[in-house]
């Protein structure tokens, strides 16, 4: 947020009209598989559950949304990192105000994600797709998707790889390492690998 504000002079990232929609976006990313609640994981972040936890705690507290905290709490073992402990005691006191589930179809235009589902229960179908550019991601994975149905994962993204391994540049960042549909055996142009969405 500081980098963005310094580069653009725009300090709106912490205003309610920007942050409140993030609750629905996070709620859309949760899905059931193997009797566990999961968070759709595109890319090479090893543990989305931990990496986003303090953000979910903050949003839950700021907008009094116990539903968001409860879903995160089903996935995690509680606070893990310093930032988590800043908000965890606050979210424990939240009361359930019946925050509605977001619509079954959701598009995040600024990140290029889209999700659709038949519902929010364990046996509902969930589909998410990653499109467009991703700032600082550097994988040729536009079009990769996640699909689950009846509490089972059917298609997931490829997971993580150590940056130091030869396979990282040679294979892992290529379209073939991701579950995307290739056209005539081809995916996104290799020249795009170093370009991401920039602020200026």
PLM feature spans:
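Carbohydrate-active enzyme catalytic cores, enriched for enzymes
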Residues: 2-155
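Active-site rim segments in enzyme catalytic domains, especially the processed small/beta chain
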Residues: 140-200
């Amino acid at each position: 947020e500081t980098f963005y504000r310094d580069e653009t002079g725009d300090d709106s990232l912490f205003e309610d009209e920007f942050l409140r929609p993030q609750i629905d976006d996070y709620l859309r990313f949760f899905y059931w598989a193997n009797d566990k609640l999961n968070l759709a994981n595109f890319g090479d972040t090893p543990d989305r559950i931990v990496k986003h936890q303090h953000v979910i705690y903050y949003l839950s507290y700021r907008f009094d949304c116990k539903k968001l905290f409860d879903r995160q709490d089903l996935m995690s073992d509680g606070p893990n990192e310093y930032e988590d402990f800043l908000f965890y005691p606050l979210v424990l006191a939240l009361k359930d105000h019946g925050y509605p589930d977001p619509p079954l179809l959701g598009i995040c235009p600024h990140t290029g994600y889209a999700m659709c589902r038949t519902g929010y229960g364990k046996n509902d179908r969930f589909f998410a797709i990653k499109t467009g550019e991703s700032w600082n991601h550097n994988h040729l994975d536009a079009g990769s998707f996640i699909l689950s149905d009846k509490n089972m994962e059917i298609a997931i993204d490829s997971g993580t790889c150590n940056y130091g391994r030869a396979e990282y540049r040679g294979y892992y960042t290529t379209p073939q390492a991701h579950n995307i549909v290739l056209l005539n055996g081809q995916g996104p142009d290799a020249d795009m690998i170093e370009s991401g969405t920039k602020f200026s």
